[in-house]
Amino acid sequence: MKYYFFFLIILSLKLTAQNFENSIKKTDKLVEKFQNKNKIPGIAVSISYKDKLIYSKGFGVSNLETKEPIDPSKTKFRIASMTKSITALTIGKLMEMDSIDINKSVYTYLKKLPKKKYDFTVKDVGGHLAGIIRVPTGERYDCKNTYSQADFYNSFENDDLLFEPKKQLSYSNYGYKLLGLIIEQQCGDNITNCHRRLILDKLNLDNITPDSKNNESLNNNFYIEEKGQNVLAPCLDCTFKHAQGCYISTSEDIIKLANGIIYKDRLLKEETIKELIKTQETLEGKKTGYGFGFSSKRDFYGNYYFGHNGGYQGTTTEYRIYPKESLVITVLTNKSGDFRLDDLLNEIGFQFIEQIK
């Protein structure tokens, strides 16, 4: 009997893939064209529909020297600021545990945090509305960095806010460091363990792990372009950066994470998810297109989605959740540059959504 049910599952997956045969062929061409135009060594693309993986392919290589092919189930990429969604989900879990109220002042949780001219809430910080500058003065991302958690309170005291909270959106990794400190205090552990225990382990996401400067065992390299050639990205220091970024993942584990968000009670309650993905507004009532750890907007074709992108030296990434269509798209690359990954996701999304309609 168990073989019969296994056969039905395989048959169902094959039928689903066949339903999207045209979209799959067009996606192959779109990705290949994008990869060739931008000289990207490796890309992983994974797509699910109604919680089923209908497309998962690797293009190119993870290492230009060894020619190791991209495997969407195994090849890990830097996901950069996509990590902010994991931090937001962790805060969402702490909200459900009555450990955090995002509408309260950050000073409620960090009593020793130096006072600024204006007060601001946890939600303001999560939506990049608090006026905090992008990165702390003195922090570097290369391996000459000496800035650490021990420096946070001193730098926060000396770094001025850019504007009155909620006046406008200003993207801030610095703010997510602050959120990480709140999580650590309310969770009672370091940020990566809190991510793991409250979110990642709930979905058995073993391939989403903290990044470090010692990833040689992965047989992965990350690239930038210099004088028209792909060269190795500089060493990345991840000290005190795991609330804002500095994770690696396979594209398929990002799909699992995304489906854990949209299907009820796998991770968080429906009302918690709605609170996190709802676009925030400025003092003047202008929608920012960003919730709490999630972009929340419409694509080029007018289809609503939420998700996050990520970019740093050696990576350009994005995932999108189209809730109305039950469609999830993840694209991870091992190169940074000025190419527009948004455009590729717009076109991939369009191909599948047109067939779903």
How should these model regions be labeled?
Residues T239-I248, F306-D338:
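Glycine-rich phosphate/pyrophosphate-binding beta-alpha loops
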Residues M1-N22:
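Bacterial Sec-dependent N-terminal signal peptides
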Residues D299, K335-K357:
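Short, gly/Ser/Thr-rich active-site loops of penicillin-recognizing serine hydrolases
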Residues F34-A44, T66-D124, F163-Y174, H242-G245, ...:
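Short active-site loop at a secondary-structure junction
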Residues K52-L53, S99, Q229, L327:
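Residue-level signal for well-ordered, solvent-exposed loop/turn and beta-edge residues enriched
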Residues F20-F77, D101-K104, N158-D159, I353:
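Short, conserved catalytic-motif segment at the N-terminal edge
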